[in-house]
Amino acid sequence: MSIALLDIEGTVCPITFVKDCLFPYFSKQYPSYLRDVSFPIDKSDGGLADVLAGFPKEAVASIDQLKNHIDDLVARDVKDPVLKSFQGLVWKEGYAKGDLKAPVYEDAIAFINRSKSVYIYSSGSVGAQKLLFSHVDVNGASVDLTPKLKGYFDITTAGFKQEKDSYLKIAADIGCDPADVIFYSDNVLEVKAALEAGMASKVVVRPGNAELSESDKKSYECISSFTAE
């Protein structure tokens, strides 16, 4: 396969990084971003208001209602495009300050470095993906892997990850046949959708990932490292 399409959490970095590091960092920091926002939010205000105005009208009527809405989305891990954009803004500053570095697995770093055509597909925004891969933790230093990546896809540019059509769109956007792509993910339903679209696909098994059923282990090709890929 000449083109690799990679999921992020649970695949190239620990699933705990997002839930135990990025999400808590966002939840702690985001209220400070709302101090200068006027409520009810009007998109014409510009700046951050343009992003937040994408939330339901009732959610942006007051700062307390907005906080409740955001906290609920985060708690339920809802893949909301507006939330993802706001998170990306907060994380951008966190990476810039050195508060955040991405713990990408060594075998994944080596795979990206030796591969000729690697794309990323995550439910996190493209902006957040670029931030993560431009601030990879290598022995305490922040390393930029983005020059090795050919492109990025998220739920706004490609669609939801458990839908076959999303993978067909990605192949079309890359300009290749789906059969030329191999998709790696820890999520069996995502792997299933990619296979249905005609891509090759493998389930990535990492510490902390959801346990695979015996049926899934037999039905899908599984790897625990990119070393042999």
UniProtKB/Swiss-Prot annotation:
Q: Where in the cell is it found?
A: Cytoplasm; Nucleus
Q: Where is Mg(2+) bound in this sequence?
A: D7, E9, D186
**Which residues are noted in the entry as substrate-binding?**
S122, S123, K161
- Name what cofactor the protein needs: Mg(2+)
What does the record give as the reaction this protein catalyses?
5-methylsulfanyl-2,3-dioxopentyl phosphate + H2O = 1,2-dihydroxy-5-(methylsulfanyl)pent-1-en-3-one + phosphate
The first-level EC class reads: hydrolase
Q: Name one GO molecular function term.
A: acireductone synthase activity
Q: Mind listing the UniProt keywords for this protein, alphabetically?
A: Amino-acid biosynthesis, Cytoplasm, Hydrolase, Magnesium, Metal-binding, Methionine biosynthesis, Nucleus
User: What GO cellular component entries does it have?
Assistant: cytoplasm; nucleus
* Annotated family: Belongs to the HAD-like hydrolase superfamily. MasA/MtnC family.
PANTHER family (UniProt xref): ENOLASE-PHOSPHATASE E1 (PTHR20371:SF1)
Subunit description: Monomer.
What name does this protein carry? Enolase-phosphatase E1
